[in-house]
Amino acid sequence: MIKIIGAGLAGSEAAYYLANKGYKVKLYEMRPKKNTPAHVTKNFAELVCSNSFRSNDPLNAVGLLKVEMTHFNSLILEAANIHKVPAGSSLAVDRNLFSEYVTEKIKSHENIEVIHEEVTSLDPNEYTIIAAGPLASDLLSKQIQDHLHLESLNFFDAVAPIIDAKSINMDIAYLKSRYDKDEAAYINCPMNKQEYLEFYKALMTAESVAPKDFENNVFEGCMPVEDMGKRGIDTLRFGPLKPVGLTKPNGEKPYAVVQLRQDDVNKTMYNMVGFQTHMKWGDQKRVIQMIPGLENAEILRYGVIHKNTYLESPKHLNNAFQVRDIPKWFFAGQISGVEGYIESAASGLNVAINLHNLLTKGEIRPLPVDTMMGAMARYISNYHQYFVPMNANFGLFDQIEAHKTVRKQMYYDRSMHALKEYIEGGI
């Protein structure tokens, strides 16, 4: 029997893979008996931040990661492709239909027993995958800290508001994907210089909610928009509000652009791209309604701040996501030091493959470092002076000296060759 803690992206992926291999799995999920500050449903694999799984281009790092995962029959990608919504060259999903699908597949599997309880004690002698996500409970966090002799596990993260599509003024906003690449999948709210400066001033003077022990420890992928703005007046214009490739229908080039991405199949909800925030709700409404096209915006879900949890993994995990001092324990998902939805799911798949190898062959065959899955495992297990959670990127690979376009194709080819050899060697 294998114990898995957490039915998020990583835990669901690991449970499904192992159950399909014939193992009996006990999957612990404390929701809905005990909720978290960010989750709003009782479903597994709930997406609490964006609804985007990012690029589908296999010559993009996260696109390559998706290709690798399909070789292992990823449940998360299966669900995502069934319940995708238009997003240009990216993969985005209807978050509710997506998580409902994952939940049904897990709950209906004959080898998976779902237990809705908070895990408050851990046994070093049980095969355990800890995939409690970035919102692990205090009691579980304390158990992890005690067994691994840690001082801390916590940092804080923020999520973006969702807008009612009917309240968006399409006389001002317009549909377009950057550089007109693929279908016009984003709603764009353009600003001229004066509008941007007024918006920026309001953003910088908005009041934020922060817990007393907030340490301002955030990573780039989900940094609150107001914190990013504090880096400089033009930081947002070169980040989430960059206008390049988003020329207005009349040919005019905007000074800055706020993008909104479809959040559901019915196109009733749009989330604000890169607009994670922990502003107080009154200020959120005031600042958002200063954006041209959103002057009458109805906010369906306000941005919120919530606690995240992750290990300083290189001190504790090897490249199989296995705890060095407690070999029956594995960590997966954001708690293991990966960043991003697909990365979390991939780590769950990685752990499941490693545990299966350990139980059937008596040893682990880590995925090759020429694959993105293997490169990420190497990252979380190798020494870094300042370890931070990391998403998929080609910088994790052993570098190839070639022109950028050619280099990406070579990375892809090398990964597929390494993966083919790995699978042929027996999983």
UniProtKB/Swiss-Prot annotation:
Family note: Belongs to the MnmG family. TrmFO subfamily.
Enzyme class, UniProt record, top EC level: transferase
Catalysis performed (reactions): uridine(54) in tRNA + (6R)-5,10-methylene-5,6,7,8-tetrahydrofolate + NADH + H(+) = 5-methyluridine(54) in tRNA + (6S)-5,6,7,8-tetrahydrofolate + NAD(+); uridine(54) in tRNA + (6R)-5,10-methylene-5,6,7,8-tetrahydrofolate + NADPH + H(+) = 5-methyluridine(54) in tRNA + (6S)-5,6,7,8-tetrahydrofolate + NADP(+)
GO molecular function annotation: flavin adenine dinucleotide binding; tRNA (uracil(54)-C5)-methyltransferase activity, 5,10-methylenetetrahydrofolate-dependent
Protein name: Methylenetetrahydrofolate--tRNA-(uracil-5-)-methyltransferase TrmFO
Function: Catalyzes the folate-dependent formation of 5-methyl-uridine at position 54 (M-5-U54) in all tRNAs.
Lineage: Bacteria, Bacillati, Mycoplasmatota, Mollicutes, Acholeplasmatales
Cofactor(s) the record lists: FAD
One Pfam family matching this protein: GIDA
Alphabetical list of Gene3D superfamilies matching this protein: FAD/NAD(P)-binding domain
